Amino acid sequence: MEEFQGYLDXNRSRQHYLLYPLLFREYIYALAHDHGLNRSILFENAGYDNKXSSIIVKRLITRMYQQNSLIFSAKDSIQNQFFGHNKNLYSQILSEGFAVIVEIPFSLRFLFSLERKEIAKSHNLRSIHSIFPFLZDXFTHLDYVSDVLIPYHIHLEILVQTLRYWVKDASSLHLLRFFLHDYWNSFITPKKHITFFLKGNPRLFLFLYNSHICEYEYIFLFLRNQSSHLRSTSSGIFFERIHFYVKIEHFHFVKVFFDNNFQCILWFLKDPFMHYVRYQGKFFMASKDTPLLMNKWKCYLVNLWQYHFSVWFQPGRIDINQLCKYSLDFLGYRSSVRLNSSVVRSQMLENLFLINNAMKKFETIVPIIPLIGSLYKSNFCNTFGHPISKPSRTDSSDSDIIDRFLRICRNLSHYHSGSSKKKSLYRVKYILRLSCVKTLARKHKRTVRTFVKRLGSEFFEEFLTEEEVVFSLIFPRTYSTSRRLYRGQIWYLDITSINDLVNYE
């Protein structure tokens, strides 16, 4: 095991990057500003000539290292002469600087891995829709699935220790530890099962959270690649700055028990049909045949989180379900595997046979209730899904109102083009279309019926998507044929982000 540990340390970071001096370079904060977390916060302090100065950073670091300034009560922090109401401003500046410099080792390693694997031009691999054809090909042959929420209660020291494997600059890590202990409670707010980051400071803490997940998956991939008993192929590792996506096919199982000193005993059990996919704050894994290997994999995960990452996790929170009786809420879709039965009549001489064929089909539908909830929060409809007008848009011109509704409708249709059943999508388009009409009627102080007659049928044709227009041109007379083709699943490889209305979790 010492040999494995040495290999992990050697491959995490091959170079020592001196990052601490970069905190005092003003171009680092200009770079962070251009990345667009909060584009105005660095220029709202008129006392420093409208620019982020290295003097601010030096003074903040000096105060952080002083024992008296590390403890603030709720009243004293408001009246503090140095921090005062600008405490959030200074912490925002420093957090943006940290976020840029700690990403440097990861970015260099990412570019190196792309050059080594020669997949730099494979931009389609970063598409969200690219995962669904993979699931469609693989999940129809699987039997059991587990949908697991990744534990989020991560201790600060665990985060810093994780970065120690990648960043070898002791000064930066020491300052980061001071910074996190001082500002942790003001930056994140636990809510239900997910850690929500405050809008003013998401970048650094999202990076820390994803680096923790990356460390867990790095051990996972290391054990798979280094063991001769685990011969498998990986379909791709997507290493992004904010979100990391990993999809692995033909994964073989490893059972590992960790203790505090990272000593372990390995049992290798071959399972050529284990699949693992992570998305947002969850992951799911699926396997074929009996649930025995799923239970062993669950045991591995629980021990990994509890003994290596010091995160308490109850095994009972990982349920093993039959794939044919379970639906996955995944990236705006509700995915499931359904059995389609067909009876074939066969006759040989005087004997008649009825053959019942059961075929598995991967279905993806649009969950209408959560999507209507998102439309309700955006004031497009009420809680029952009835369209309403948007008073905030009545000050805009008619063309701007129509263009905005058309853009939202087409983006949703484009994202949900892979749905097996379009009925829910048609209902969403109806809500947006009628909400647009009601907004225009409210602006001109007319009834909806009068305004619809004024717009005519051409207005409703504008809400047709590109696919519907193309099919109507190819099959102008055979409406049933075009409708049957449009009902099929269409996956686009240019979708790299989730629509705000789709991301309702």
From Swiss-Prot:
The keyword tRNA processing applies. GO terms for molecular function: RNA binding. Pfam families: Intron_maturas2 (PF01348), MatK_N (PF01824). InterPro entries: Domain_X, Maturase_MatK, Maturase_MatK_N. One of its GO terms (biological process) is tRNA processing. One of its GO terms (cellular component) is chloroplast. Keywords: Chloroplast, mRNA processing, Plastid, RNA-binding, tRNA processing. It is found in: Plastid, Chloroplast. Belongs to the intron maturase 2 family. MatK subfamily. Usually encoded in the trnK tRNA gene intron. Probably assists in splicing its own and other chloroplast group II introns. This is Maturase K. It comes from Kunzea ericoides (White teatree).
